Structure formats: C-alpha cells, structure tokens
C-alpha cells in the first residue's frame, strides 16, 4: 500500500498536471469504488467542475474542484495517470475523468480496493475517513509531547502503534519497520514499556525517515509509480524491510521476519532491543 511518502509524490506530480482542467464527463466502471454517494450522483456533482489543486492528508489525495473536494485513497495498487483520450483504456482502468482539452485522468487499480468520495469544498475534515487522522509526521502538529503521551497509553506493540493513523498519519508497514530499526527498538515491544529515550528516538526516526523518503520519491517495492510513471528511489535505502536473511547493515546479523498482527515485520535481533 502506498504510504505517505508515495502519496505525497503522487500529489506533487498531479499538482503539475491537472489544475485548470475542466471535467466534461466522468465514467465509473466499478461502482463500488465510489463511497458515501451513489455513483450517478458522484458523476452529476463533478461534471462541469474545474480542478483547482491537489492536496494530501495522511494517505488520502484531496482534489479541490470549483464547488467540492474529492477524497481518494489508493489502497494497495491504485494509480492515477493523465492520458490522451485516444489512448487505449486498460482493463484495470476503473474511473475516468474526461476533460474539455481531450485528455483524461484515469484511475487504475488491479485489485479494485481504491476508493473515492466527494464532500463539500475543503470539507474533508468532517468525513469519517479524515476526522480520525492524527498529525502529519512532517508538520509542527507532530510533537514529541503528544506522541509520547499516545505511545505510553497503549500496551500494543510499538509497530502496531505507529500504524495507528490516529497517532500519526501516513506511516505504513514499510516505514514502521525502518523507523523501529533506526530507533534500535524491537517492533513487537509493548509501546508502554518504552523509556523516554526510546520514544524520543522513535519520534526523531519517524521525522527523518519520512523526510528522506518523500525527497527520494517514495519506495517502489512492488508496483508503485507516481502519476508521471516514475519509480521511487527510497527502496534503495531500506535497511530491514524486505531484507529477510540478509546481513544487517550495522552488525551483520541476519535480518529476521515475523508476523505481527498479521503484518510481515522485519528487524535485526541484535541491534534492536
């Protein structure tokens, strides 16, 4: 699933491509992808609207139109591509926004898990999806004090806590593993067992890793590309995720993989305590 660094890079590339484009037709080929609104109403609300800009909140893309905002979640495999109207439509293209300039923004999703919903303009904060999100890791709202308070409140594994979007928005499986490694903390440690120093290390690692991942275009470990079809580069920086049985870059101990609450989880049994 694309995490915050990947979604931010999708946002940035879309922001270069679609503002100013006016929608004259919307085709919904998989109705279940439209949530909170009947698909025909979704289409009716969008025709005639102009895209003014693209924002992001957590793992959600926010398309600001003339009179409304579209919330889009990529889930596991969702991708946006801007194409000419005459280009072949692939079988994995499920939603098409056709523009007056004869281009199309197409939403492709092999697994059909992606979702879209429409809300009042800038009204995403009132939706169930956005209302529950915690602070972004690269904003001033993400503070050590609040983070430590949240961590100390739960007996869940620290990795599980990092994946809780109410604690910090945008961290997923890849970066949670990398954060725990950088902080030298075992991912299965009970969050409320961590010392203040360990919590501070996790906080700092969250900010530094997410910052670098955004700068490098995210991680392409499966099929992720941005909206211009470019691969991420942070996968070349990963130290534990996907490195099962490879030597730790710090100590040489083989990286181990376990299941933690159903998630494949990678760590160094020597460096992380």
From Swiss-Prot:
Alphabetical list of InterPro entries matching this protein: DNA_glyclase/AP_lyase_DNA-bd, DNA_glyclase_Znf_dom_DNA_BS, Formamido-pyr_DNA_Glyclase, FPG_cat, MutM-like_N-ter, Ribosomal_uS13-like_H2TH, Znf_DNA_glyclase/AP_lyase, Znf_FPG/IleRS
Cited function: Involved in base excision repair of DNA damaged by oxidation or by mutagenic agents. Acts as a DNA glycosylase that recognizes and removes damaged bases. Has a preference for oxidized purines, such as 7,8-dihydro-8-oxoguanine (8-oxoG). Has AP (apurinic/apyrimidinic) lyase activity and introduces nicks in the DNA strand. Cleaves the DNA backbone by beta-delta elimination to generate a single-strand break at the site of the removed base with both 3'- and 5'-phosphates.
PROSITE patterns (alphabetical): FPG_CAT (PS51068), ZF_FPG_1 (PS01242), ZF_FPG_2 (PS51066)
Family to which this protein belongs: Belongs to the FPG family.
Active site: 2-3, 59, 263
GO terms of molecular function: 8-oxo-7,8-dihydroguanine DNA N-glycosylase activity; class I DNA-(apurinic or apyrimidinic site) endonuclease activity; damaged DNA binding; DNA-(apurinic or apyrimidinic site) endonuclease activity; zinc ion binding
Binding annotation for DNA: 92, 111
Reaction(s) the record says it catalyses: Hydrolysis of DNA containing ring-opened 7-methylguanine residues, releasing 2,6-diamino-4-hydroxy-5-(N-methyl)formamidopyrimidine; 2'-deoxyribonucleotide-(2'-deoxyribose 5'-phosphate)-2'-deoxyribonucleotide-DNA = a 3'-end 2'-deoxyribonucleotide-(2,3-dehydro-2,3-deoxyribose 5'-phosphate)-DNA + a 5'-end 5'-phospho-2'-deoxyribonucleoside-DNA + H(+)
Enzyme Commission (EC) number: 3.2.2.23, 4.2.99.18
Cofactor note: Binds 1 zinc ion per subunit.
Cofactor: Zn(2+)
Official protein name in the record: Formamidopyrimidine-DNA glycosylase
Transmembrane segments: none
Keywords, ordered alphabetically: DNA damage, DNA repair, DNA-binding, Glycosidase, Hydrolase, Lyase, Metal-binding, Multifunctional enzyme, Zinc, Zinc-finger
Zinc finger (FPG-type): 239-273
Subunit (UniProt): Monomer.
GO terms of biological process kind: base-excision repair
Disulfide pattern: none
């Amino acid at each position: 699933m694309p995490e915050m660094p990947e979604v931010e890079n999708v946002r940035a590339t879309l922001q270069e491509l679609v503002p100013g484009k006016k929608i004259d037709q919307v085709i919904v080929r998989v109705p279940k992808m439209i949530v909170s609104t009947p698909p025909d109403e979704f289409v009716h609300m969008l025709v005639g609207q102009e895209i003014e800009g693209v924002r992001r909140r957590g793992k959600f893309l926010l398309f600001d139109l003339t009179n409304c905002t579209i919330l889009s979640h990529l889930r596991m495999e969702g991708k946006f591509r801007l194409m000419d109207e005459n280009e072949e439509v692939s079988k994995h293209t499920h939603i098409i926004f056709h523009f007056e300039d004869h281009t199309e923004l197409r939403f492709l999703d092999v697994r059909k898990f992606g979702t879209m919903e429409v809300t009042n303009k800038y009204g995403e904060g009132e939706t169930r999806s956005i209302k529950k999100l915690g602070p972004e890791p690269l904003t001033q709202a993400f503070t050590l004090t609040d983070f430590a308070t949240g961590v100390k409140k739960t007996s869940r594994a620290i990795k599980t806590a990092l994946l809780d979007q109410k604690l910090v928005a945008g961290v997923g499986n890849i970066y949670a593993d990398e954060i725990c490694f950088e902080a030298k903390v075992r991912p299965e440690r009970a969050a409320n067992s961590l010392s203040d120093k360990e919590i501070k290390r996790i906080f700092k690692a969250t900010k530094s890793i997410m910052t670098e991942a955004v700068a490098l275009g995210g991680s392409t470990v499966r099929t992720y590309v941005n909206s211009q079809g470019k691969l991420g580069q942070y996968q070349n920086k990963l130290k534990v995720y996907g490195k099962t049985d490879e030597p730790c870059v710090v100590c040489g101990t083989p990286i181990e993989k376990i299941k933690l609450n159903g998630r494949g989880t990678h760590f160094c049994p020597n460096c992380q305590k």
